[in-house]
Curated annotation (Swiss-Prot):
One of its GO terms (biological process) is lipid A biosynthetic process. It comes from Treponema pallidum (strain Nichols). 4'-phosphopantetheine is transferred from CoA to a specific serine of apo-ACP by AcpS. This modification is essential for activity because fatty acids are bound in thioester linkage to the sulfhydryl of the prosthetic group. NCBIfam families: acyl_carrier, PRK00982.1-2, PRK00982.1-4. Keywords: Cytoplasm, Fatty acid biosynthesis, Fatty acid metabolism, Lipid biosynthesis, Lipid metabolism, Phosphopantetheine, Phosphoprotein. One of its GO terms (cellular component) is membrane. It comes from the Bacteria. Residues 2-77 form the Carrier domain. This is Acyl carrier protein. PROSITE patterns: CARRIER. One of its GO terms (molecular function) is acyl carrier activity.
Amino acid sequence: MDELFLRMRALVAEKLEVEEASITLDSSFRGDLGADSLDTYELVYAIEEEMGITIPDEKANEFETVRDAYEFIKSKVT
C-alpha cells in the first residue's frame, strides 16, 4: 500500500467512523462503509484540506468506491 492510500484510508476511517483495516480500494462508500450524503461531503472537504487539492462537486458525486476517489486524488497530487 502506498503512502497516499494510507493517508486517504486514515481520513475515511476518521470521517466515517470505521476501522482502517476494513477499508480497501474496492470498498463502496455507501454500501460497505455506510456513508450518507453528508458524510460524503465532509469526507471530500477533509480530503481537499489534507491533500491541498480541489475536487469539483460533479466529480465527487462520481466517487462510488475508495478506488474512484484514490485514482482522482492520485492524478492531482502526482
